[in-house]
């Protein structure tokens, strides 16, 4: 949620900042702005709405080689031009952009700023006014910046300009992602490396409660007490072409099509020369020593976790619980004696999951992160990490990250089973290869799936997805995809629960998408379809080859029964995509949603 960029170098800062913000659009935002410094002062341009709107108001006549930029997701104050970042101090000396939530900003206003008239409703403006107050009291800018950050409770990633010293950007971080990119004669600031790949692929990780003093030729990292910190940059495992649509009309469609290649990439990364699964011995040992596994996740990652539970319990005979991250700490379950926590997050920055991880580490328990972003907060703070190797996922609605998470969970479950001496009776690597081929087949059936979306969903108000056993978990994900991008009220239900209330919502023409990929519940789910059809529903049955019947709407290529979620979700992704397209929705950037949820 939100995004920050900063640039100090020799090129036109305006265009670099705007391009950087465009690369952060996937994170979700409702307004955007930039500030660039010149000898005459700091020039601010900001607007409610898209970055394209911001571009229209930027004065191209202003020449600058230093600046900061921001995309805002409203948390304090409505989406508006006034509340958009950047914000300035009362005298306009200091200019700030900020991601995160300052939990004690009201108290800080009462304690320090009663004589200041604030111009916005944001928590951010309090921060920049505090810096100015402490400078007026005689502190240096650096000392005032550190003093201010030491007072803040909550999360923040901050970049600050001083119009009396336009050769410096002051940066601070706590519980919100922020990187500093380095290059000869040029340095940059970004919430995400993707934003500044146009400038450099060398980045410094900034830890919580650190500040960075960034000039054109130097980067100095310090703790809040002023202690200098030494750190080497790392090379971002990204290519600029990874974050372009190429010939695709939308990132979501591109990322759906990339799924077969992602699965093959995962196989390559986690396969020994003899064809067996290769995981770090430390991870294997941690899983083996655990008497219960607790999977913590949110949204799509939570749905992957539900499938992961089935895989681990069925393969490795190890008990697993799956919890929604935002709810876990409110009523923590009675933990087993030797728990292992697995955190699943595409970005590795999910605030709710990080909150649980912090508490878990305080209790002394081991944690494993499954993420698509190496070097992310969850990756750094957990004991172990499994990387999903899916490549950048730009569309807000997750597709390839979901199937990648399930593939990695498959390998984790299979490796644990092997370590326990359990014979699965099949080769997981080989079966995942079959899955990749099946995915490719499905991605080539877009016309059929577009027709289903047009016939069933283009004009509907609501839709229900039903399934049993593992299919139910995929139905939850299919419903989420549809509601995320098409704004259709969609819900996933266990087939057996229909008669316990949901069937009351069925009326003439209600679309029902039913999954039938599991032999042991095939007759039961078909019975549910007959129940709703008898009450006027418009059923769409998606079945597995070998279980299909003549009137089924769509038939999936056959894969191993435990791995059906990796293929059955693809038609649901494509149906959601085409439904959104036919309804005129913004597929890649749906309203009110953010890709990376970095505030609680």
UniProtKB/Swiss-Prot annotation:
Annotated catalysed reactions: D-fructose 6-phosphate + L-glutamine = D-glucosamine 6-phosphate + L-glutamate
EC id: 2.6.1.16
Localization in the cell: Cytoplasm
Keyword annotations from UniProtKB, A to Z: Aminotransferase, Cytoplasm, Glutamine amidotransferase, Repeat, Transferase
Every Glutamine amidotransferase type-2 domain range: 2-217
Cellular component, GO, one term: cytosol
Pfam families given in the database record: GATase_6, SIS
Record SUPFAM superfamilies: N-terminal nucleophile aminohydrolases (Ntn hydrolases) (SSF56235), SIS domain (SSF53697)
Active site: 2, 595
Gene Ontology BP terms: carbohydrate metabolic process; fructose 6-phosphate metabolic process; protein N-linked glycosylation; UDP-N-acetylglucosamine metabolic process
Gene Ontology molecular-function annotations: carbohydrate derivative binding; glutamine-fructose-6-phosphate transaminase (isomerizing) activity
Domain of life: Bacteria
Protein name: Glutamine--fructose-6-phosphate aminotransferase [isomerizing]
């Amino acid at each position: 949620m939100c995004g920050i960029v900063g640039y100090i170098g020799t090129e036109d800062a305006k265009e670099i900042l705007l391009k950087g913000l465009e690369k952060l659009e996937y994170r979700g935002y409702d307004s955007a702005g930039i500030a660039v410094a010149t000898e005459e002062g700091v020039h601010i341009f900001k607007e409610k709405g898209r970055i394209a709107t911001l571009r229209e108001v930027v004065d191209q006549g202003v020449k600058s080689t230093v600046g900061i930029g921001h995309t805002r997701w409203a948390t304090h104050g409505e989406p508006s031009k006034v509340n958009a970042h950047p914000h300035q101090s009362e005298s306009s000396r200091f200019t700030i952009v900020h991601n995160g939530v300052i939990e004690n900003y009201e108290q800080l206003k009462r304690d320090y700023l009663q004589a200041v008239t604030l111009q916005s409703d944001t928590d951010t403006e309090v921060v920049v006014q505090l810096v100015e107050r402490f400078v007026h009291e005689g502190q240096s800018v650096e000392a005032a910046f550190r003093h201010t950050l030491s007072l803040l409770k909550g999360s923040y990633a901050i970049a600050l300009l001083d119009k009396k010293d336009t050769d410096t950007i002051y940066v601070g971080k706590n519980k919100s992602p922020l990187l500093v990119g380095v290059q000869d004669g040029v340095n940059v600031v970004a919430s995400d490396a993707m934003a500044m790949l146009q400038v450099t692929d060398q980045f410094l990780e900034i830890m919580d409660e650190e500040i960075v003093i960034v000039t054109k030729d130097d980067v100095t990292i310090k703790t809040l007490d002023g202690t200098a910190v030494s750190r080497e940059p790392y090379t971002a495992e990204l290519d600029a072409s990874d974050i372009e649509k190429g010939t695709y009309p939308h990132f979501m469609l591109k990322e759906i099509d990339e799924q077969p290649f992602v699965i093959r990439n995962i196989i390559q990364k986690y396969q020994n020369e003899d064809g067996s699964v290769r995981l770090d011995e430390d991870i294997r040992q941690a899983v083996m020593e655990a008497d219960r596994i607790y999977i913590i996740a949110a949204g799509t990652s939570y749905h992957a976790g539900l499938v992961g539970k089935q895989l681990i319990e069925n393969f490795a005979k190890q008990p697993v619980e799956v919890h929604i991250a935002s709810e876990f700490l409110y009523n923590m379950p009675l933990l087993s004696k030797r728990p292992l926590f697995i955190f699943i997050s595409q970005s590795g920055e999910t605030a709710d999951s990080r909150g649980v991880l912090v508490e878990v580490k305080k209790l002394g328990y081991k944690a494993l992160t499954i993420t698509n972003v190496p070097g992310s907060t969850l990756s750094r703070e957990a004991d172990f990490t499994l990387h999903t190797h899916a490549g950048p996922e730009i569309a807000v609605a997750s597709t390839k990250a979901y199937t990648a998470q399930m593939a990695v969970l498959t390998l984790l479950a299979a490796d644990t089973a092997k370590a326990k001496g359990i014979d699965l009776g099949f080769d997981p690597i080989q079966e995942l290869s079959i899955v990749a081929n099946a995915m490719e087949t499905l991605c080539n059936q877009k016309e059929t799936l577009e027709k289903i979306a047009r016939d069933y969903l283009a004009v509907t108000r609501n839709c229900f997805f039903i399934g049993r056993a593992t299919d139910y978990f995929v139905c939850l994900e299919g419903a989420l995809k549809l509601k995320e991008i098409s704004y259709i009220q969609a819900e996933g239900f266990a087939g057996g629960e229909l008669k316990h209330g949901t069937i009351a919502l069925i009326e003439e023409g209600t679309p029902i998408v039913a999954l039938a990929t599991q032999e042991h519940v095939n007759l039961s789910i078909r019975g549910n379809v007959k129940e709703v059809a008898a009450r006027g529903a418009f059923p769409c049955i998606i079945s597995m080859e070998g279980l299909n019947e003549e009137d089924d709407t769509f038939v999936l290529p056959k894969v191993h029964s435990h791995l059906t979620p990796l293929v059955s979700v693809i038609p649901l992704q494509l149906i959601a995509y085409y439904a959104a397209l036919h309804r005129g929705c913004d597929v890649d950037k749906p309203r009110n949603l953010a890709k990376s949820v970095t505030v609680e």
